[in-house]
């Protein structure tokens, strides 16, 4: 698994690709998909072709020029800043999943210093990906829920009083 940092426009591209993946799930989840041109859909070359068991899928993004308005460097200006990393899995679509990681345990105060009387916590969103599974010459696809950390927020700590 490879990890790299990702910022603004790349994050938007990831989100758009995720939505695209969800759009074709009703077709792809019900079928075995042989070679379609994208390496995600390719079976081993030694496997015989499956007659009538294919579909064409254009994974290009429609209206890619429409940008989602995002504030610049929101991950650095937050009172609970975070970094973006990308995980790579060739048997998952999308193969790249962006995750946020909180930079601090505490929150950043008005003076720019960490305040440990507050807690920086991850904001998580459950999303669907497509998982490719090989069983001999058979390739199947299955929906998988993944928990993606999309940012961090500052909260008051939970204090338990011992009696």
Curated annotation (Swiss-Prot):
GO terms for molecular function: cytokine activity; cytokine binding; cytokine receptor binding; protein heterodimerization activity; protein homodimerization activity. Keywords: Adaptive immunity, Cytokine, Disease variant, Disulfide bond, Glycoprotein, Immunity, Inflammatory response, Innate immunity, Secreted, Signal. One of its GO terms (cellular component) is extracellular space. Glycans are attached at residue 83. It comes from the Eukaryota. Expressed in T-helper 1 and T-helper 2 cells, basophils and mast cells. It is found in: Secreted. Disulfide bonds join 102-152, 107-154. Residues 1-30 form the signal peptide. The keyword DNA-binding does not apply. One of its GO terms (biological process) is positive regulation of cytokine production. The keyword Glycoprotein applies. It is linked to Candidiasis, familial, 6: A primary immunodeficiency disorder with altered immune responses and impaired clearance of fungal infections, selective against Candida. It is characterized by persistent and/or recurrent infections of the skin, nails and mucous membranes caused by organisms of the genus Candida, mainly Candida albicans. Effector cytokine of innate and adaptive immune system involved in antimicrobial host defense and maintenance of tissue integrity. IL17A-IL17F signals via IL17RA-IL17RC heterodimeric receptor complex, triggering homotypic interaction of IL17RA and IL17RC chains with TRAF3IP2 adapter through SEFIR domains. This leads to downstream TRAF6-mediated activation of NF-kappa-B and MAPkinase pathways ultimately resulting in transcriptional activation of cytokines, chemokines, antimicrobial peptides and matrix metalloproteinases, with potential strong immune inflammation. Homodimer; disulfide-linked. Heterodimer with IL17A (IL17A-IL17F). Forms complexes with IL17RA and IL17RC receptors with 2:1 binding stoichiometry: two receptor chains for one interleukin molecule. IL17F homodimer forms predominantly complexes with IL17RC homodimer, whereas IL17A-IL17F favors complexes with IL17RA-IL17RC. IL17RA and IL17RC chains cannot distinguish between IL17A and IL17F molecules, potentially enabling the formation of topologically distinct complexes. Belongs to the IL-17 family. This is Interleukin-17F. It comes from Homo sapiens (Human). The gene is IL17F.
């Amino acid at each position: 698994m490879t990890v790299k940092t990702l910022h603004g426009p790349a994050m938007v591209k990831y989100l758009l690709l995720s939505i695209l993946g969800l759009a074709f799930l009703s077709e792809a989840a019900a079928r075995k998909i042989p070679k379609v041109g994208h390496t995600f859909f390719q079976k081993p070359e030694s496997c015989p072709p499956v007659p009538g068991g294919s579909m064409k899928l254009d994974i290009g993004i429609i209206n890619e020029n429409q940008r989602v308005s995002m504030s610049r460097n929101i991950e650095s200006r937050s009172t609970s800043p975070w970094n973006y990393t990308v995980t790579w899995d060739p048997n998952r679509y999308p193969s790249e999943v962006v995750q946020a990681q909180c930079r601090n345990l505490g929150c950043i105060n008005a003076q720019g210093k960490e305040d440990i009387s507050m807690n920086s916590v991850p904001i998580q969103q459950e999303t669907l990906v497509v998982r490719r599974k090989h069983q001999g010459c058979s390739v199947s696809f299955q929906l998988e829920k993944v928990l993606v950390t999309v940012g961090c927020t500052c909260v008051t700590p939970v204090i338990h009083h011992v009696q």
